[in-house]
């Protein structure tokens, strides 16, 4: 077996791990946006959260397509344990009378996790087309994070 084959398969395995981790994060994010959106009172925020949930589903599908194109793992649904805990916390806040500010705070925490996941992924050695895709997705996530934060902050000043 040549060294190049080992290096190539190692790089493929690393890419697979990075993409699978991001897919789990995106699944958490998709569910989080949908769950929080269900509890928000502001209609325009509800629409934004539904759109973001759908966008995260699209991001996830793009990454799954890259895995399939490279002949790698099938993705199993599930998300992360941290994501499940975070969503449960958001649901509990909503059920205990959480206002939109508190829900946006929870959403921003989730977006902080997504930002970190993308930063960590882009710190890895990945093929250029994958890096470009992740950079585009990351740019959207940063914009979304800033939108959530600015609306959360605006609710404090009202």
Where are the model-predicted features located?
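Generic structural concept
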Residues: 16, 23, 27-30, 53, ...
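Alpha-helical scaffold segments that form or flank carboxylate-/histidine-based iron centers
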Residues: 14-22, 43-61, 100-104, 129-143
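Conserved alpha-helical segments that form or flank metal/cofactor-binding pockets of metalloenzymes
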Residues: 45-81, 148-151
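Carboxylate-rich helix-loop segments that flank metal/cofactor sites and access channels
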Residues: 62-115
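Alpha-helical bundle segments that constitute or directly flank the non-heme di-iron/ferroxidase center
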Residues: 7-41, 100-125
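Preference for long, well-ordered alpha-helical segments
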Residues: 107-158
């Amino acid at each position: 077996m040549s060294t190049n084959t080992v290096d190539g398969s190692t790089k493929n395995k690393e890419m697979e791990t990075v993409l699978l981790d991001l897919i789990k994060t995106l699944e958490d994010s998709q569910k989080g946006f949908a769950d929080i959106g269900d509890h928000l009172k502001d209609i325009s925020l509800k629409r934004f959260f539904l759109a973001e949930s759908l966008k995260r589903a699209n991001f996830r599908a793009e990454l799954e397509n890259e895995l399939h194109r490279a002949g790698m793992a099938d993705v199993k649904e599930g998300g992360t344990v941290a994501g499940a805990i975070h969503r449960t916390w958001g649901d509990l806040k909503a059920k205990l009378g959480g206002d939109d500010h508190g829900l946006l705070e929870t959403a921003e925490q989730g977006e902080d996790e997504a930002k970190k996941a993308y930063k960590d992924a882009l710190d890895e050695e990945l093929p250029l087309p994958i890096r470009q895709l992740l950079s585009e997705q990351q740019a959207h996530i940063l914009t979304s994070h800033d939108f959530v934060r600015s609306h959360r902050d605006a609710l404090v000043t009202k």
